[in-house]
């Protein structure tokens, strides 16, 4: 089982330290924070080659959450759209040097929920993904798109629309299934998981109370994870605990791993 943590969950600015913490907490996978590649022109970044070497030495599998802060791959503003693509490609290039094999991105948003705007935004996203998938394929990096909440400013109105969009890529585009997001969405986890399952190669897992994205440790919200343990324990992809609540401690992170592994 490839299971571990989001870089942000471990509350450190050092990737090597995050790798060490991941091992101590019972994980074997770490998801890098792609925005760090862009902050102050990468000022906080460690050399990707040294990250790769340290990860291999510690037997840690690396994935990356591609940039999402101020990024919109569906933007109608050409300059923002182009810079968003450029930012994603820069992060993929860095990630490939660091040894990542899988990367996650967000779909983007619209200023108003209107059928015409949603249609046009999806076209912009499709075009952006064509550039991104072409680059990722050269680097042997798999790209997964994350299911949103399907709220007012999302470019997909529901999970069925999201599913139809993904099918249009003929298997080249995979899905990062976010349990917390699905729990908030109107159709819920069961329907969303069953619909998207053929495309899911990556999972983000965290808890909430069904109203907002709280990123809590497992068991601290209202998701009944017992229903999904068989799926998770037999899953061939990567599982990332995206527990970013400031209230959760490392003991909570460790227990979340143990719950999924069946150790508690």
Predicted stretch roles:
Residues 3-7, 30-32, 62-66, 103-105, ...:
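Hydrophobic faces of well-ordered beta-strands that scaffold small-molecule active sites
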Residues 41-45, 74-79, 115-120, 154-157, ...:
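Short, solvent-exposed loop/turn segments at secondary-structure boundaries
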């Amino acid at each position: 089982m490839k299971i571990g943590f989001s870089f942000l969950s471990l509350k450190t600015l050092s990737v090597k330290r995050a790798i060490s913490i991941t091992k101590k907490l019972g994980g074997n996978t770490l998801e890098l924070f792609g925005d760090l590649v862009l902050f102050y022109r990468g000022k906080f970044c460690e050399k990707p080659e040294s990250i790769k070497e340290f990860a291999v030495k510690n037997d840690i599998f690396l994935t990356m959450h591609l940039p999402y802060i101020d990024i919109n791959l569906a933007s109608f503003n050409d300059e923002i759209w182009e810079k968003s693509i450029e930012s994603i490609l820069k992060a993929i290039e860095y990630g490939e040097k660091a040894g990542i094999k899988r990367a996650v991105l967000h779909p983007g948003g619209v200023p108003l929920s209107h059928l015409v705007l949603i249609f046009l935004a999806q076209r912009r996203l499709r075009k952006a993904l064509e550039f991104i998938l072409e680059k990722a394929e050269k680097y042997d990096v798999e790209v997964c798109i994350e299911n949103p909440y399907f709220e007012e400013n999302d470019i997909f109105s529901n999970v069925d629309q999201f599913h139809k969009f993904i099918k249009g890529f003929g298997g080249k585009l995979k899905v990062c299934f976010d349990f917390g997001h699905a729990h908030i969405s109107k159709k819920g986890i069961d329907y969303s998981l069953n619909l998207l399952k053929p495309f899911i190669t990556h999972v983000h897992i965290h808890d909430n109370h069904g109203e907002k994205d709280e990123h809590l440790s497992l068991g601290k919200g209202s998701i009944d994870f017992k229903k999904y343990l068989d799926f998770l324990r037999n899953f061939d992809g990567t599982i990332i605990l995206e527990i970013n609540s400031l209230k959760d401690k490392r003991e909570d992170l460790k227990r979340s791993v143990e719950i999924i592994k069946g150790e508690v």
